Structure formats: C-alpha cells, structure tokens
Amino acid sequence: MVDALIFIEALFLAVLALFTFAFVISSIWEGEKRAATIGGVTFCILLGGEIGLFALKTVGFFQSMPGLLILLVGLVFPVVALLLLIRTGQNPRALQGTKGYIVGEVKRFDEREQVFARNRSLPPGSEQYRMFYSEHPQWEEHDAKRRERGGPLGVPGAIDKPHEGPNVAALFASFSIPPYLGSSHIVQPEAHPHFHEEKISLSPEEATSRVKGFALHLGADLVGIAEINPLWVYSRRGEIFWDNWEDWGSEIEVSHPYAIVFAMEMSKDMVWTAPHTASVVESGFVYAKGAFIATELASFIANLGYFATANHLRHYDVLLVPMAADAGLGELGRLGYLMTKEFGPRIRLGCVTTDLPLIPDPPVDIGVEDFCRVCKKCAHCCP
C-alpha cells in the first residue's frame, strides 16, 4: 500500500517536473527571462521534492503515521489543485458576445482618434490638423513626439542593421497591394453586367454556407457571421489616403444588417522576429491577403444581387475586433487583440458588410477572461 502511494507520488512529481522543464526551455528559447526564472525555481522545487521523497522512503519515514499522513496530503493537494483548474461552467458574459461586457453608455468610436489616423493621415499645419488638436489638445504633444520617432511603427529598419536595406524593401513591398483595392468602386462593387441586376435566390442557410466556403477557398482560416451592432461602426471618417479631405470627419453610416468576419493566421516564425522588420513584413502580407479576400467576397455578393462593402487596410467602416467576437471567432483578450482558440492573437482580421440574408454565429467562450485574469504576460512584456 505505502509503496504504491510512493510510486504514484513519484510519478506525479516526475510528470510535473518534466512539464516544467519543457516550459523553462521554451521560455529561454523565446527570450522570456521572467517566465524562465519562475519555471526554473518551480522545477528545482519539484526536483527537490522527488529526491526528498526517495530519501525519506530509504529511511522508512513513510512507515510511520506522520509519514503516511504527509504522503496522503502530498497526493490529495495536487489532485485538488488540478480539479480547481477545471472549468465548471461557461462564462455567461462571453456567450453574449460584446454585449456581455458593456458597462454604462458606450459611444461610437471616431476613426479620427485612432492612432494611425492621427499620426499617418493628419498633415501637420493643415486645417484638419489644427481642428483636430484644438478638440483634443491632450494628444498633440505625444503625437508630435511619435512623429519625430518615425510614426506609429518608428523608423523602418532602424534596429535591423546591417540588413535594413532588403528588410525595408520587403516591408514596403508587402504593403503595396491594399492601396489598389481601396477606392470606392472596389470596396463597394457593382454586379458584373452578366447578371443584369437580377438577384440570385438563395436561402439564408445556403447563402451562409456559400459565403463561408468561398472565403475559406480564398484563403481565410476562420469565418463567422455577426449581426452588426451599430456601436461597432465608426462614427466619422478619419483615415485619408488619396487627398480626399472632403471625407475627413464625414459621418459613417452602415445600413447592412450582417457582417462576414474572417481571420487569417500569421506565420509564427515571422511574428517571432518582432520587433524587427520581418514581423511587420508579415503584417503587410496578411493585410494584403485580407484586402484580396474582402474584395473578392464583396464582388461575389454583389454578383448575387446584394450590396456589400469590403473592410480592409485601406477602408474600414467597422471595428473588426468586437465584430469578430460577436461573430464567434474568439474573445477579446487583455492585450486588446482577438484571442482565437486556433491561433491565439496571431491573426489579422477582415470583414465584408452586406444586406445578403445570413445566419449569424453565436459568440464563443474559450476561457479567455479567466486566463487573462491570471496570465498578464502582455502587461509584463509591453514596453
């Protein structure tokens, strides 16, 4: 009996020690000093426990009543700890999508306040610049310093020496496609003349199946449907790319009831090069992929006889992260990104809004709120 309990305890400690050792190696490989330190200390404690277990067995300690009690507690405690980690129920807030997290009054977000619109679109000295910072003086000094450092992403290639030349060349090349797909007649396409303005009859079930299948065929990795919550529609236009300053500050209205939201996986190898330029090259590549998918998908829906608007890097009407959460692609993480079950936050999003009748997907609960409450790795790592 005692020998069996000792064997079970030793096996349990060995499994935990091996798991912790693998965690330490992974943390060292990722350059995560804090995680490696905590993991290393834990591994030493577990290894010490394993050695102590066999040392006490050798002297016959576990044949005594105190030794037997310690052995039983040593078995019960980790079992109870593991049971406490098992989720006993779903998170009702997550299952409501973004509605479950709204507290008080929420106003629609003005795209002009978005960091890229402020630092990339607003020319210093322009009328729009003066108008914006007269309304938001708290950001002017901070944004001016950011521009001096090269904008939202800094000076391209500054930390890549001596490889900055080809790296920056790849960076700008990776962002070269979306501008060609951002004009109004492309993001809001008309049907091909072949269809003579006729609607193709599809049930919501078949339309949903075909739309999702086409998006996956085009290269999306995840696809979901959401009913559009007006709160996640930008209130006013802020990103300007073709000197169409008459649109700056114009009200954005989306009359479409549905959003087709899709996610694309980013290369793990490329993302792990961050903060070097290769990680941004991957962002540009996946943004280009998203622009292609959204454009093709909107054109497909237009050919069916319905209205559709592509949302991608050069045209956004809606905030994609809350829309993706409502479409069941994942949950909002503490780091501000969508956390997916399949890829974590290592994704980019795209969207098409439409009046094509579709079947919405339910929001999901994958445990992100509970995980983020104890992890906080983003808070420790963010500069």
PLM region descriptions:
Residues M1-P230, Y234, G238-E239:
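Iron-sulfur (Fe-S) cluster-binding modules
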Residues D221-P383:
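Catalytic cores of enzyme domains
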